[in-house]
Structure formats: structure tokens, C-alpha cells
Curated annotation (Swiss-Prot):
PANTHER family referenced in this protein's UniProt entry, alphabetically: 3-METHYL-2-OXOBUTANOATE HYDROXYMETHYLTRANSFERASE
Pathway: Cofactor biosynthesis; (R)-pantothenate biosynthesis; (R)-pantoate from 3-methyl-2-oxobutanoate: step 1/2
Protein name per its UniProtKB record: 3-methyl-2-oxobutanoate hydroxymethyltransferase
Location(s) in or outside the cell: Cytoplasm
Length: 269
């Protein structure tokens, strides 16, 4: 799909499927606010993810677990208003994707009704098949998330590379059979991601999953140098915006201290 074609219509589940079928890579980045989402949308990003990673990169938590459904709705509303062309997917936070089926369906319905967003992301594979089917049956598109599942951190004992190819393929196939329109694969060996992609007909989106997938997703703060502390092996710094902000703030402080800001041109008579 050319940039001009992207500008003509909204990216949908069908768009993503067509892209996968013709071998066109899908791009996906996180967004949590209006101005960032607007810039990413204008740049031609196919899918914006309002991730529960907001808990770590914006709120300062060490995990995604403290994030609430109301907080996800708050951020999703801003991103939904900003995106004119990108598809917007919203995470179901812990434990809203793990409680009873009706609760999850209601949370997914809130996303579609209140935020102008288009789908939800649900962590889990085979064990979530019934939930995925219930949500899709209620008219809520679901992106399944397999491999490393951050909401499962305490069960796994940390963030660990997932190597069980047989289980990963089974998870992907179960999610596809239940109606998931895409499978996101996190932190698995390239060989596993390739096997998953070959095993399903829906698009696969990788994060730390190598090249042999239908598309890629990263945390926007990571690629812009806005994340303090640990940066995952699988990310890449595309622009050091964090340092630019730091230098701009320092220059502002220096000029205010020196009484060189504001100048006459920046003042009213």
C-alpha cells in the first residue's frame, strides 16, 4: 500500500489481512496521548497500540499490572481522537482480560463505545480461546498476544524468552480459530516466530521475534530515547529525542537565569 493510498481510507482488519496476503510489512507503534498519536498517524504508521505499557513508560511503574481499565479508556480516548487513518488497538489490562467472560466483553465494548478505537489486545493463546470467541461474537475485534506475556510476570518469574515452539504454534492456531484477526508474538526465537507465521493465515506482529513475521511493533518511547533505565535488546534508537528535550530544557533554564529570555520581541508593550 502506497502512502497516498493509506491517506484515503482507514486501516481495518481487512486492510491488515490484505497486507499480510501480499507480503507487505505492517507497522505498529505505541501511543498514549493526542499529539504523539497525531504525529505517528501522519507519518503513516498502520496500527497504533494504546498499550498497558503506559504503566511503565509514562506512569513510572516497574510492571504493567497497576494499570486500570479506566486509565486505558482515558488514554485511548486521546489516541482515538488523533488517528484519522491508523487502526487503533487498546490493551485489556490486568485483570480485565482474565476475569469472567462477561466482564471482558463489557470492557471490550467500553473501548469501542467510549474511545473511537477499533479493537482490543488480549494476552494469552489457547487458554483464552473461549474469551476471544465471546468477544468477537459480541462484535469486538481481538488481537491475541502470545509468547512473553507481561501480565503473567509473576507466574513466569520474570520476563523470559519463550522457546516452546509447539506450544506457541498451538496458542496461535487456537487464537486464530477463535476469531483473532492478528497474533502479536513477543520475545520468541526467530525460528519460533517463523513457525507461527507459517501455521496461521492471519497476520503476525512481532516484538523481539525476528524478521519472519507480517509486521513489527515497538514502544515509541524506546525508539525515541525517552525511556530511562533498561532498554530491551530487540529495540532500536531511531532518534535521540530524549537528549534533544534535555538540551532544550537546559538552554531554557540557562537563558531564564541569564535574563535573556524573554527578549523584547517575545514581550508585549
Amino acid at each position: 500500500m502506497t502512502e497516498s493510498e493509506k491517506r484515503k481510507s482507514r486501516i481495518t482488519t481487512r486492510t491488515l489481512q490484505r497486507m499480510r496476503d501480499r507480503g507487505e510489512r505492517i507497522t505498529m507503534l505505541t501511543a498514549y496521548d493526542f499529539p504523539t498519536a497525531k504525529i505517528l498517524d501522519e507519518a503513516g504508521v498502520d496500527v497504533l497500540l494504546v498499550g498497558d505499557t503506559v504503566g511503565m513508560v509514562v506512569q513510572g511503574h516497574s510492571t504493567t499490572l497497576p494499570v486500570t481499565m479506566d486509565q486505558m479508556i482515558y488514554h485511548a480516548e486521546m489516541v482515538g481522537r488523533a488517528a484519522d487513518h491508523a487502526m487503533v488497538v487498546v490493551d485489556l489490562p490486568f485483570p480485565d482480560g482474565q476475569l469472567d467472560l462477561l466482564h471482558s466483553v463489557r470492557c471490550g465494548a467500553r473501548v469501542l463505545k467510549e474511545t473511537q478505537c477499533h479493537a482490543v489486545k488480549l494476552e494469552g493463546g489457547a487458554e483464552q480461546a473461549e474469551r476471544i470467541e465471546a468477544m468477537v461474537g459480541a462484535g469486538i475485534p481481538v488481537m491475541a498476544h502470545i509468547g512473553l506475556r507481561p501480565q503473567n510476570i509473576h507466574v513466569e518469574g520474570g520476563y523470559r524468552l519463550q522457546r516452546d515452539i509447539e506450544r506457541l504454534v498451538a496458542d496461535a492456531k487456537a487464537a486464530e480459530a477463535a476469531g483473532a484477526f492478528t497474533v502479536l508474538i513477543e520475545c520468541v526465537p526467530s525460528e519460533a516466530a517463523a513457525a507461527i507465521t507459517d501455521a496461521v493465515k492471519v497476520p503476525t506482529i512481532g516484538i523481539g521475534a525476528g524478521r519472519d513475521v507480517s509486521g513489527q511493533v515497538l514502544v515509541t518511547h524506546d525508539i525515541l530515547g525517552l525511556t530511562s533505565g533498561y532498554t530491551p535488546k530487540f529495540t532500536r534508537l531511531f532518534a535521540d529525542v530524549g537528549n534533544t528535550i534535555r538540551e532544550a530544557a537546559k538552554s531554557y533554564c540557562d537563558e531564564v537565569k541569564a535574563a535573556s529570555f524573554p527578549s523584547d520581541a517575545e514581550s508585549f508593550e
